[in-house]
From Swiss-Prot:
Family: Belongs to the NOP10 family.
Keyword terms of this UniProt record: Ribonucleoprotein, Ribosome biogenesis, rRNA processing
One record GO biological process: pseudouridine synthesis
Pfam family, one: Nop10p
Organism: Archaeoglobus fulgidus (strain ATCC 49558 / DSM 4304 / JCM 9628 / NBRC 100126 / VC-16)
InterPro entries: H/ACA_rnp_Nop10, H/ACA_rnp_Nop10_sf, Nop10_arc-typ
One GO MF term: snoRNA binding
Gene3D superfamilies xref list: H/ACA ribonucleoprotein complex, subunit Nop10
Gene: nop10
Coiled coil: none
Protein name per Swiss-Prot or TrEMBL: Ribosome biogenesis protein Nop10
Disulfide bonds: none
Entry keyword Flavoprotein: no
């Protein structure tokens, strides 16, 4: 069985449990999402960047 490390967002400690044993907050997995070459949300991200002017410095 594969068990992944989890991190407490409040105190920053690592654990294997759903709740932090020190402060009792919920933990999350600090691993990044999987990379996909198809990028199903790419068009939405590009649209948002265009709307907020993220690429305004480029010509």
């Amino acid at each position: 069985m594969k068990v992944l490390m989890r991190k407490c967002g409040k105190c920053g400690r690592y654990t294997l449990k759903e709740r932090c044993p020190v402060c009792g907050e919920r933990t999350h997995m600090p691993i990044p999402p999987r990379f996909s070459i198809e990028d199903p949300y790419g068009k939405y991200r590009r649209k948002l960047r265009k709307e907020i002017g993220f690429f305004s410095f480029r010509r």
